[in-house]
Amino acid sequence: MLVLKNKFYLIICLLFQTMIFSQNVTMVDPSNNIGIDKWGIVNDGVMGGISQSNIYLNEANNIIFAGNVSLENNGGFASIRRGFDGNQLKEASKFLLRVKGDGNIYKFRLTMRGSYANYSANFKTIKDQWVDIEIPVENFQPYYFGRSIRAPKLKVQKVNSMGILISDKQEGNFLLEIEHIKAF
């Protein structure tokens, strides 16, 4: 009976450990119907720029973020974003993006409830190659209208939106294919 009790406790402990330490929240995965329906486009047109972008699903059911960044009229950015309930993230310590890019540098951005800042982490793509981008939470830096600011550290449980941005004077056509975005 003692052996049976110990096995029971061991199983409960292992299950509990798995629940705590292997948190895996899929934030974006078109193959599981977590796709583009809640995404919106925000380009530099909000400031007089003329950059253009689009978001759609390709034949592989991956998200495509594509367009053209123009520096005319003091423009220079294109972005997609969507609302997200950070309560699902709880204690996530990193994000994993699986993307195929064009060699450009993109920003993965998060915003928190009650904060005017956005928290960004840059990632570089390799032209026409799939890459897994791992971004620890501590790598996110606070920005306000593209300028680095002093602000509280990112708290993932308060995240209320996420997005992808191309900026930093990377003029021309761009294309980013997103297979998934996950939090661990």
Which residue ranges define each predicted feature?
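Bacterial Sec-dependent N-terminal signal peptides
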Residues: 1-25
